[in-house]
A protein has these predicted regions:
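Short S/T/G/P-rich N-terminal loop/turn motif that feeds into the first structured element of a domain
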Residues: 1-51, 55-70, 78-95
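Glycine/threonine-rich phosphate-binding loop and adjacent beta-strand/alpha-helix elements that clamp
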Residues: 73
Length: 95
């Protein structure tokens, strides 16, 4: 399983809006993607730091996942104070 982890920076006062956009726009879009297996958004409203984690059942469709990422970032680009940092990891253990 592949995990896409995105480190986000926003203004602390925009945390609730980021959560709204992620919940109402990003997650429904993700559910339409092939091999999507879950999404989590972690936030620190005091600092404006956010971490998005999405899980994918396979790496076969990496190009599609990259396209999804670009579309996802567009949904909340106006809230960002820095360019998001994206990394991919292999998910080795689920407990």
């Amino acid at each position: 399983m592949l995990a896409m982890v995105v480190d986000l920076r926003i203004s602390p006062m925009d945390t609730k809006e980021l959560v709204r956009v992620y919940r109402d726009e990003v997650v429904p879009l993700a559910r339409e993607q092939r091999d999507f297996n879950g999404a989590w958004l972690l936030t620190d409203p005091d600092t404006g730091v956010g971490i998005s984690i999405t899980l994918w059942d396979t790496e076969r469709h990496t190009g599609e996942i990259e396209g999804f990422y670009d579309e996802k970032v567009e949904k909340f680009a106006a809230l960002l104070t820095e360019t998001p940092v994206r990394k991919h990891y292999d998910l080795e253990v689920i407990a």
